[in-house]
Amino acid sequence: MSMSEETNNSLSSGKCPFHHGGSDQSAGEGTGSRDWWPKQLRVELLNQHSNRSNPLGEDFDYRKEFSKLDYSALKGDIKALLTDSQSWWPADWGSYVGLFIRMAWHGAGTYRSVDGRGGAGRGQQRFAPLNAWPDNVSLDKARRLLWPIKQKYGQKISWADLYILAGNVALENSGFRTFGFGAGREDVWEPDMDVNWGDEKAWLTHRDPESLAKRPLAATEMGLIYVNPEGPNASGEPLSAAAAIRATFGNMGMNDEETVALIAGGHTLGKTHGAAAATHVGVDPEGSLIESQGLGWTSTHGTGVGADAITSGLEVVWSQTPTQWSNYFFENLFKYEWVQTRSPAGAIQFEAVDAPEIIPDPFDPSKKRKPTMLVTDLTLRFDPEFEKISRRFLNDPQAFNEAFARAWYKLTHRDMGPKARYIGPEVPKEDLIWQDPLPQAVFNPSQEDIASLKAEIVASGLSVSELVSVAWASASTFRGGDKRGGANGARLALAPQRDWDVNAAAVRALPTLEAIQRTTNKASLADIIVLAGVVGVEQAAKAAGVYITVPFTPGRVDARQDQTDIEMFNLLEPIADGFRNYRAQVDVSTTESLLIDKAQQLTLTAPELTALVGGMRVLGANFDGSQNGVFTDRVGVLTTDFFVNLLDMGTQWKATDESNELFAGSDRASGEVKYTATRADLVFGSNAVLRALAEVYASQDASEKFVKDFVAAWTKVMNLDRFDVK
């Protein structure tokens, strides 16, 4: 049969000639590039959270909208909701206190201090995979309970802020005094695709604590927030869980005292749910039927809700007053002897064997039960170091209250970055070391002062490469995940940053810039470091025949050493910085993948990444002064030579050794070696997407465009942490 005959037959039958059923032919379905090439470079990660996915538009100002919010009325509505039990998801003891605390905890608890990703700062609990994690069973109901409130206040309160505020109000409603609340978390409108949740393909795959400590993961099993409450790999052993607890809470930047306070405080209120076997529980929200409207885990056990609810499979109530704050967690932990038992769902837990039935039933006031604990709760009694802290909290409830208030505040605000981002009437005045505090501004340089400082920098004798390198070293520590790092504070001049291997050459310019700061006394060192980069880029552009003024916004301040947590700042030390052709001797990923990772942390787009790398190479900004990727004989001139020479087919590239990290580029005709390069250089010729961008800048008409694009991207990086002026 000919094609025309097939088409005519299809038309006569009323069918689309090309859609005959069978395989899914909708957009995005079918075999894709990553099915064929699983290791394909994820350049698309740099296109996340653009204005194309934001229904509010680029002009939306959340801080401005929040200022219109009746904050006390909002808190009043949340408080009323706590005891407004709904038949479709009845509240335990008539209160949603425990549910909302868990929702806030599990939103914030995905944060990892190693890479700054995760956390509650963008409302990611609405999206996969977090909305469908095994550890988040039933939190879809918590979020749905909040919808009428979100609907009422609209864009004056983000989902991200509302989740955490609901947890705070729940604690306050239980009689607990919180440390405070800072709003300012802005929603995004799609899942974060850059977060590495792990390599496991099956939920609840166990991870060894030692390997966990080497990776930026915040849970011991895929799909958990922290640790398996039944012990490592459901071992039922409290003491063996200590290492896993320390590893996971440590990856969030929590010490032992904060860890004990958080576990005990979180388990002072509410309960776990394990009325029957997990076989009764249906699929998660992402896999549920369309008519389920985003709700998942429907249970076939009894009514499926209330007394019949199944969440974790554990059936534990810790306190005699599960909706009111108390010290019963520690009192029960140490007062009774505990025997291992199983929940109705078959999960391992512990029961107080010598205790009377003093725990109220959540739905039948005539019933009582014995106190119960999770395996990991008992770790706080049997691990020697945790036990010391727990006994202190047992004997000093006020110390426990203070420790939990501060630890909860840290947990729920850790990924928000500097205090300048916080808004609202309940922001505490106290500066905390984990917020990377900054002093008040001392200088307010005028335009004349700035011009004078630029002249001083020009006269200093520092080269373009030195000027650019010191500014980049200062600003490029910024992480878009938790908003830490950046040039504000001039922490490049402090420990530990001044001692990092990647900064060894860059910091050589600091004594000269510090002398300028002291003698002129017109601006902070932080401003002068960034201004040095401005001077370097302007000189390089001028040498290329393009006269351009690089934007500069003063107002940065200089942090003190006592405002700098060395251990936490060491987490900002890059494993790799492809912009400076730096890679530590750590086998974690390919160099080009680490380049994408760094660019994503700097919130750069793929074109911005391309322009910056090409510019940094011709400006001679390699961390060690090497010639790798410096495809020019005009170092210090902001030309497109990197792209022109990289894409020249007259050059043939070969690896110099078996590591495939360093390459030599030889003239195809003569065999003479012309250049050396790393994977962070050659990827702009090998990856199809990056090559397409490189071709734009290699074109003969691109010289001025390249300078303008480089300046725009450079200025963006220099100002990433300027929340004081945003």
Curated annotation (Swiss-Prot):
Taxonomic placement: Bacteria, Pseudomonadati, Pseudomonadota, Gammaproteobacteria, Enterobacterales
GO MF annotation terms: catalase activity; heme binding; metal ion binding
Name of the protein in its database record: Catalase-peroxidase
Record-annotated site: Transition state stabilizer: 102
Function: Bifunctional enzyme with both catalase and broad-spectrum peroxidase activity.
Biased composition (Polar residues): 1-13
Cross-link Tryptophyl-tyrosyl-methioninium (Tyr-Met) (with W-105): where in chain: 226-252
Subunit structure: Homodimer or homotetramer.
Cofactor or coenzyme needed: heme b
Post-translational modifications reported in the UniProt record: Formation of the three residue Trp-Tyr-Met cross-link is important for the catalase, but not the peroxidase activity of the enzyme.
Matches recorded under Pfam families: peroxidase
Gene responsible for this protein: katG
Source organism per UniProt: Enterobacter sp. (strain 638)
